[in-house]
């Protein structure tokens, strides 16, 4: 999603990777469905969410920005291995082809890594959020109104 190769190899292509613009949808849906990737078997591999430290950095860069871009850089290193697997026929998109175990494991790990990062962002935001006094006040008013109309 964050490289120019998100939907087929773009630009110079000395290794002859696919330029098929359906690779994105295949990875996000077709491969997972064909390989039978499901949530339940992955759950034991899901670690607890962690809070991203928002402590000021010596370099004065925003800690959340750094955490997100570090994650993206790590994921970018996975782009070429994916295209190598496609070139080797391991993604199972051809009629009658199977999804190889290597490709299944690769996609499962990308899902787990993405979930780990999303959970860290969510937990960090939730823990750092101020109390929602507006909604609490609305709930108190609604409960008070309901109490007045009760028999």
Q: What are these regions, as identified by a protein language model?
A:
Residues 3-151:
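Active-site- or binding-pocket-proximal scaffold segments within functional domains
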């Amino acid at each position: 999603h964050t490289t120019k190769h998100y939907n087929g190899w773009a630009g110079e292509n000395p290794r002859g990777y696919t330029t098929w613009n359906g690779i994105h949808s295949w990875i996000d849906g077709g491969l997972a469905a064909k390989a039978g990737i499901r949530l339940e078997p992955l759950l034991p591999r899901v670690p607890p969410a962690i809070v991203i430290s928002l402590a000021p950095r010596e370099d004065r860069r925003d800690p959340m920005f750094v955490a997100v871009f570090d994650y993206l850089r790590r994921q970018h290193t996975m782009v070429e291995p994916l295209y190598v697997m496609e070139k080797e026929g391991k993604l199972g998109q051809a009629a009658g082809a199977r999804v190889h175990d290597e490709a299944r494991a690769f996609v499962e790990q990308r899902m787990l890594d993405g979930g780990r990062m999303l959970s860290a962002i969510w937990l960090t935001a939730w823990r750092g959020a101020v109390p929602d006094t507006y909604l609490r006040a609305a709930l108190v008013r609604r409960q008070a109104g309901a109490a007045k109309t009760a028999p």
